[in-house]
Every structure is written in structure tokens, then in C-alpha cells.
């Protein structure tokens, strides 16, 4: 990350540097902040999962992904950072006394982590230690179905909807559910039409709940742009047609879910602090400069679908078809490794 920051700092076409980090240790944050304070360019930084207590004149410390994006845009225009979170206020539901839970079935860890953070900060419910969940409290569950434990021998959920379809099917029998959260991430490498895959499952889930006499709300957010091959607007329309309420961002989606169950998460109040400018070595290796600005040649190992982006960008590539042995099961891989090198009699 630090090398990338230095490279962006040296690029004259870059006006604002935006840094996104998954949950990190304090020592890592101290090191990264030291580098950021040595830059002259304005910076927006997000240490996802943390509640920022301060911001700086040249470095804006953000709380959520949406705030990060808006802050970066505002800084690029020379404006003061001003962000007000939003909810979908026209969404209502008549939940019964048992329906108090939020369930998030995410295809990736970043949005899942943000959802977990917002729900925890709003409700105060601590998460149990369970590797199957990003967050599992008394009433709420957030799952990253893109985690390694869910993708052993199977494609990532941004490519294959199977695990999320199963999750929605199982959720139909969960009487505690009030709100379901879904993301649909567009772009190269993702499913060509994920919304069409999720739509029947959403319709079936809502119908099952209606038959059981329960109102539930399915919230969905489409992550992408109108330039993505899947079609941003069409993906939103398909999900909305299936009965999902479409939110513009994950931040808005989670806050809307919290509002539906009578909870709210407050934006952190940040004072402006001053720190001495640091004197970090900002030298950028020539190899990194070449990687960023030079022409690429790529070896693509695995899914051939990833080469579509390379073809569209007219990048030279070589495709190498490969998949892990034993479906990625580490124990079976060790057995196969042993047998492949065993020279005795069996």
C-alpha cells in the first residue's frame, strides 16, 4: 500500500489520493499516516471498521465507503468535505414481535465489514466468535460468502450465485428476519447478469414469508457504473422487479435496514487536529512506475472469463487454464502431494 501511495503521489495526473484499508492494526495505521502526512496532495483515508475521532487539514478521515467517495470528489473540486448519510424513508413494514433481525448475504468482505460495523455501532450488540460470519450477534448476522470457507472448490459468489441462492432459501424458515441485505457487484469478471439469477430467489423468499404471514424487506444495492458490461440501470430494474428495494450505496442500505427495526447509527463527530509534516522517503522504484504507466503483458491463470477485460483494453495476454487439485481442500491436497511423490509399494 505504501509503495502505491508513493507512486500516486509522483503521478502529475493525480489530484487527490484515496486510501482504503480493511481492519488494520494501530501500528500499521501509524506507519501509513506518517507517509500520508509527508504528502502535499490532499488525501482521504478510510480504515474500515474504525470510528475516526479526528480529521486533519490535508487528510480527511472517513467513516464509511460512501463518505470516502464523496469526500474524494469534493476535495478534487477544491470544496470542503460535507457528507450527510441518507436512508430510504419511503420503505415501511409491519413486523411482528419476533422479527428483529437483519441478515446480510454479501458477495465480498469489504461491504460485509462495513455493514457489520454500522450494525454493531447502532445496536451495541457484540459479535460472537464464529468464522462463518463477519458479524453474528444475538439478533443480526452478516456473512461474506466470498470468504475462503465458502469458496473451497466453488467459484466466487460474484461469479456463481449458488451459495446466495441457498442462503435465501434457508432464510425463508428464519422467523426472526425482518430485513435482508444483498449486494450485486458489477464489472469485469463478475457474472454477466447476476440480478437475473437472484431475482427468482428473492421472489420465492418474499412469497414464502407472505404465506407465513410475515412482512419482510429485501434491500439491495448495485455496485458499479453505467459503463459496466452488465448494465447498471438494468440490474437495478431486475432486482426491483423481483421485489427488492434498491439503495444507492451500502451505507444507505444498512442505515435503511437499521431504521426499519428502530435503530440508528450516528455519524462520528471529528475535531480537526494538527500534526507536524513528516519527512518520509517518497522515492518510487522505476519498476513500479513502469507497472503503472507502461504497457502490460499478462499471464492469466484460471478463469478464462477474466481475459475479457484484457481483450477490451487491447492488452497482450497468455491464458493458462488451471484449478487447484482436490477442489482446493488442503488436507486432500497434502494426501495427493504425498502419493505423487511416494516411491514405495502400496
Segments the model singles out, each with a brief description of its role:
Residues 1-281:
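Catalytic-core regions of core metabolic enzymes
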Residues 275-346:
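Acidic/polar, glycine-rich intrinsically disordered N-terminal extensions of enzymes
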Amino acid at each position: 500500500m505504501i509503495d502505491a501511495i508513493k507512486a500516486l503521489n509522483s503521478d502529475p495526473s493525480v489530484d487527490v489520493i484515496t486510501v482504503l484499508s480493511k481492519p488494520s492494526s494501530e501500528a500499521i495505521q501509524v506507519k501509513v499516516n506518517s507517509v500520508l502526512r509527508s504528502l502535499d496532495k490532499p488525501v482521504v483515508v478510510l480504515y474500515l471498521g474504525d470510528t475516526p475521532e479526528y480529521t486533519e487539514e490535508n487528510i480527511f478521515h472517513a467513516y464509511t465507503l460512501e463518505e470516502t467517495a464523496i469526500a474524494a470528489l469534493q476535495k478534487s473540486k477544491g470544496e470542503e468535505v460535507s457528507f450527510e448519510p441518507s436512508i430510504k424513508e419511503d420503505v415501511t413494514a409491519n413486523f411482528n414481535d419476533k422479527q428483529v433481525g437483519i441478515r446480510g448475504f454479501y458477495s465480498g468482505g469489504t461491504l460485509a465489514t462495513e455493514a457489520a460495523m454500522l450494525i454493531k455501532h447502532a445496536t451495541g450488540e457484540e459479535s460472537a466468535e464464529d468464522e462463518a460470519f463477519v458479524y453474528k450477534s444475538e439478533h443480526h448476522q452478516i456473512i461474506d460468502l466470498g470468504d475462503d470457507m465458502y469458496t473451497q472448490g466453488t467459484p466466487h459468489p460474484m461469479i456463481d450465485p449458488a451459495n446466495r441462492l441457498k442462503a435465501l432459501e434457508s432464510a425463508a424458515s428464519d422467523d426472526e428476519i425482518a430485513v435482508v441485505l444483498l449486494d450485486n457487484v458489477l464489472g469485469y469478471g463478475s457474472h454477466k447478469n447476476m440480478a437475473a439469477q437472484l431475482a427468482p430467489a428473492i421472489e420465492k423468499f418474499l412469497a414464502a414469508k407472505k404465506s407465513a404471514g410475515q412482512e419482510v424487506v429485501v434491500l439491495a444495492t448495485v455496485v458499479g457504473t453505467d459503463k459496466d458490461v452488465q448494465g447498471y440501470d438494468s440490474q437495478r430494474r431486475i432486482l426491483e422487479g423481483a421485489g427488492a428495494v434498491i439503495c444507492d450505496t451500502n451505507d444507505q442500505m444498512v442505515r435503511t435496514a437499521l431504521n426499519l427495526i428502530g435503530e440508528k447509527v450516528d455519524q462520528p463527530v471529528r475535531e480537526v487536529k494538527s500534526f507536524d509534516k513528516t519527512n518520509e522517503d517518497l522515492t518510487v522504484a522505476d519498476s513500479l512506475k513502469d507497472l503503472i504507466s507502461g504497457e502490460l503483458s499478462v499471464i492469466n491463470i484460471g478463469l478464462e472469463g477474466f481475459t475479457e477485460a484484457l481483450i477490451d483494453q487491447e492488452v497482450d495476454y497468455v491464458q493458462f487454464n488451471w484449478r487447484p487439485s482436490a477442489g482446493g481442500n488442503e488436507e486432500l491436497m497434502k494426501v495427493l502431494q504425498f502419493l505423487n511423490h511416494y516411491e514405495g509399494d502400496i
